[in-house]
């Protein structure tokens, strides 16, 4: 019998479907394991090989955990609302609903061909009214708690897309070539800032890549500083400025306010008013990226007004510049050009004074000095002296003095801004509120408020969504009077903010999720997806989850316990796959040529899961040859089947088998799938070399390989006499004594702190241990950019690098 992967894979996919093999049991007598993919947006271009990487990884873990006795929840669904589907619909002239249904069918077919062990009974779609009824319900809970509000605000408007973009979305759209401008619009906004501190502190509760945590910390942008009142004598008022460096107050030589600051025009004197107004209007046509880019030349206008420095009484000119944003701090800054790069550039351009107040090793007229590790100079008056004090002391001394004088107050600020939640488009969840003639706003009482089927779904030129043109849907009367519905829709992120909960209880019509089921399954044990979602989906979902926690809907503080970011698979030209480059490798194409098992194995064998790596067709052919070698263990020749023997294993083969089980178990647990596959290849080679067709060894191999290449393992498991699926078998165990490989685990420290471990043969020389330690990924990031000044090696136990900034 030859290895006919096409018929074998169809056979076992049909078997799993018919027998509901991967149906998740509603039982609590087993330990649970919830493994989740970031569910896809079903695009018209279909899945390519890069998309399959994360799905393959989660499927391996799902199958592995089932074999270890876990009750596994491994679902799949579709994030189908939003701009991409609508843009494609406009481009092709096909209704987004029709496109979505077609694309979902195509995606599902590919995923099923890959043999992924999803429980398809739990499939969800964000465009299903039964699903988005609960998305709308959550919105109304936000509204009820004062966390959703409307506001006339300056927004990021994309004229080409005819919609508002959230701050987090602007960079992506600009990179795609869309122009984005600022304009005032009435918007629905979610008060994510109310949860800023919890979003920050609770990052300590989760096992996420440090890089993603840091991206969220930077986006939230917590800072401790002081709000200082600068008196404006000519206006009989003051200008409030927020600074994180009150210790440099004596070095402030001018103030800058944003063009949107409410006092911008008021502070402009008659001779400067026209110039100020023109500058303010020009700033409205720029995006924040254009205004704040580090390489952007500084621009600004002088208002003609002066403020008083409370530390030394000096008059400080007040300028308007677009590098200052109203959305952060107070929209006004004190400029200390000697010790801030932007302030120094601005001062140089407009010939403003530069005063050194932090002792610098060079002339601050020639270059800025921004380090905190020095001491204050030129910083004293009759009441206070900071001279000679380091930052750690001078900050508090100045803050205390300002608070005592009543001209300053310690405060905490965040860069995070409230989430602009409404979109002026058709293809999204309707926002379930009604506006009455008496000016009141009331929630829809009957959910879901369904999206009407309309023919003209293109965006309008008025700033309202196409729903504003559907009068029979838009207007109505009830017991409270005549009303007009909200025409904005929710953004594409809404449905993905809580989908992980709906998978737990997808058919519930009474609640978003049953409390007992939620308590059993939450939180998600392993969440796999791209790091590009760090400050979009991942932040939004954490926010909604915390609101639901406060409502008592969920029992955990965080939704996703462990996050793993898979690396991108590039095209064969080493570039990101894209239609424009012509380097996209469609999933269906390689499935037809090589089969699911080969694709699954190759995707995982390419390299470490977290790393970026290029596709190589020669590589998948090598994996196909490996599967053929596995096949020949049972079918050494076409038409002939080997007879497995029941004799005891030789001592060498016994040790080989137990070592393989141990290493493959460890590597699978750690998501080091490429090295697990390498160990399987070694094991197969040993089986062929030994010439032994030992049943125990062959069955052990099939059990180890089955999460990775399930179809061929099912077929061979049946061929050697089993009448039940291999999915019902337990994972093989190993004897530690037989698996011992004379290897030791070496702790690797950097400046005395444990940063990772490496394994090496006992007695390895110093140079081997140092080389292994330097290459260990968890260690390497602490060595990058550093100078190693000493290397300490304790044989078989420890490596310590003593480093300093290099």
Curated annotation (Swiss-Prot):
Key words of the record: Aminoacyl-tRNA synthetase, ATP-binding, Cytoplasm, Ligase, Nucleotide-binding, Protein biosynthesis
Compartment list: Cytoplasm
Enzyme Commission code: 6.1.1.4
InterPro entries: aa-tRNA-synth_Ia, Leu-tRNA-ligase, Leu_tRNA-synth_edit, M/V/L/I-tRNA-synth_anticd-bd, Methionyl/Leucyl_tRNA_Synth, Rossmann-like_a/b/a_fold, tRNAsynth_Ia_anticodon-bd, Val/Leu/Ile-tRNA-synth_edit
EC category name: ligase
Main location: cytoplasm
GO molecular function: aminoacyl-tRNA deacylase activity; ATP binding; leucine-tRNA ligase activity
Superkingdom of the source species: Bacteria
Gene Ontology cellular-component annotations: cytosol
GO biological process, any: leucyl-tRNA aminoacylation
Pfam families cross-referenced by the UniProt entry: Anticodon_1 (PF08264), tRNA-synt_1 (PF00133), tRNA-synt_1_2 (PF13603), tRNA-synt_1g (PF09334)
Similarity annotation: Belongs to the class-I aminoacyl-tRNA synthetase family.
Record protein name field: Leucine--tRNA ligase
Source organism: Chlorobium phaeobacteroides (strain BS1)
Gene that encodes the chain: leuS
């Amino acid at each position: 019998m030859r290895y006919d992967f096409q018929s074998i894979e169809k056979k076992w996919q049909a078997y799993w479907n018919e027998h509901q093999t991967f149906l998740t049991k509603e039982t609590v007598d087993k330990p649970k394991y919830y493994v989740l993919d970031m569910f896809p947006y079903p695009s018209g271009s279909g899945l390519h090989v890069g998309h399959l990487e994360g799905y393959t990884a989660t499927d391996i873990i799902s199958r592995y955990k089932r074999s270890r006795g876990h009750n596994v929840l491994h679902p799949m669904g579709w994030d189908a609302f939003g701009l991409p589907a609508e843009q494609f619909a406009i481009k092709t002239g096909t209704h987004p609903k029709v496109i979505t249904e077609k694309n979902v069918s195509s995606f599902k077919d590919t995923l099923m061909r890959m043999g992924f062990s999803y429980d398809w009974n739990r499939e969800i779609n964000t465009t299903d009214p039964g699903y988005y009824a609960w998305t709308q319900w959550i919105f109304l809970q936000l509204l009820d708690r004062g966390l959703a509000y409307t506001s006339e605000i300056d927004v990021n408007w994309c004229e080409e897309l005819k919609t508002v973009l959230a701050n987090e979305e602007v960079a992506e759209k600009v990179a795609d070539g869309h122009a984005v401008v600022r304009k005032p619009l009435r918007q629905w906004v979610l008060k994510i800032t109310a949860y800023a501190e919890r979003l920050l502190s609770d990052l300590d509760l989760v096992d996420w890549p440090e890089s993603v945590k840091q991206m969220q910390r930077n986006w939230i942008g917590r800072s401790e500083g002081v709000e200082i009142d600068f008196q404006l004598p000519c206006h009989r008022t003051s200008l409030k400025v927020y600074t994180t460096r009150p210790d440099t107050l004596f070095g402030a030589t001018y103030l800058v306010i944003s063009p949107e600051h409410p006092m911008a025009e008021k502070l402009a004197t008659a001779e400067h008013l026209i110039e100020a107004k023109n500058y303010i209007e020009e700033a409205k046509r720029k995006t924040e990226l254009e205004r704040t880019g580090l390489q952007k030349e500084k621009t600004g206008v002088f208002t003609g007004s002066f403020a008083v420095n409370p530390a030394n009484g000096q008059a400080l000119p007040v300028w308007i510049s677009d590098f200052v944003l109203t959305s952060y701090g107070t929209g006004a800054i004190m400029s200390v050009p000697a010790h801030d790069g932007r302030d120094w550039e601005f001062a140089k351009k407009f010939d403003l004074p530069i005063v050194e107040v932090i002792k610098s090793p060079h002339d601050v007229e020639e270059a800025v000095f921004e380090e905190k590790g020095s001491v204050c100079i030129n910083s004293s008056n009759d009441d206070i002296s900071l001279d000679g004090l380091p930052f750690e002391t001078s900050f508090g001394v100045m803050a205390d003095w300002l608070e005592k004088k009543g001209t300053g107050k310690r405060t905490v600020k965040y860069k995070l801004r409230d989430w602009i939640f409404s979109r002026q488009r058709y293809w999204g969840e309707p926002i379930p509120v009604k506006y009455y003639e008496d000016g009141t706003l009331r929630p829809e009482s009957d959910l879901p408020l369904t999206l009407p089927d309309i023919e003209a779904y293109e965006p309008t030129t008025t700033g309202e969504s196409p729903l504003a043109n559907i009068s029979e849907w838009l207007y109505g009367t009830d017991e409270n009077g005549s009303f007009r519905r909200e025409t904005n829709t929710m953004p594409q992120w809404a449905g993905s903010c809580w989908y992980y909960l709906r998978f737990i209880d997808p058919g519930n019509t009474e609640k978003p999720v049953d409390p007992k089921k939620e308590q059993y399954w939450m939180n998600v044990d392993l969440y796999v997806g791209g790091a590009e979602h760090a400050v979009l989906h991942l932040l939004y979902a954490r926010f909604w989850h915390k609101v639901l926690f406060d409502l008592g809907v969920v029992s955990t503080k965080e939704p996703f316990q462990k996050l793993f970011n898979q690396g991108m698979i590039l095209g064969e030209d080493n570039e990101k796959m894209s239609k424009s480059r012509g380097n996209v490798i469609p999933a269906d194409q390689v499935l037809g040529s090589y089969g699911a098992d080969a694709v699954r194995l190759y995707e995982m064998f390419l390299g470490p899961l977290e790393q970026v790596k290029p596709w190589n067709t020669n590589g998948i052919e090598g994996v196909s040859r490996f599967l053929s070698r596995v096949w020949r263990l049972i079918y050494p020749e076409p038409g002939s089947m080997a007879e497995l023997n029941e004799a005891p294993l030789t001592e060498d083969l016994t040790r080989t088998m137990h070592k393989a089980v141990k290493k493959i178990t460890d590597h699978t647990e750690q998501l080091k799938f490429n090295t697990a596959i390498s160990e399987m290849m070694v094991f197969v080679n040993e089986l062929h070399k030994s010439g032994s067709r030992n049943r125990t060894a062959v069955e052990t191999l099939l059990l180890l390989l089955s999460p990775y290449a399930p179809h061929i393992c099912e077929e061979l498991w049946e061929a050697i006499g089993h009448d039940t699926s291999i999915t019902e078998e337990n994972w093989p165990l190993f004897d530690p004594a037989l698996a011992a490989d004379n290897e030791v685990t070496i702790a690797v420290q950097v400046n005395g702190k444990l940063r990772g471990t490496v394994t090496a043969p006992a007695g390895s020389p110093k140079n081997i241990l140092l080389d292994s330690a330097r290459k260990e990924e968890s260690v390497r990031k602490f060595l990058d950019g550093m100078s190693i000044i000493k290397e300490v090696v304790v044989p078989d136990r420890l490596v310590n690098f003593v480093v300093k900034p290099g």
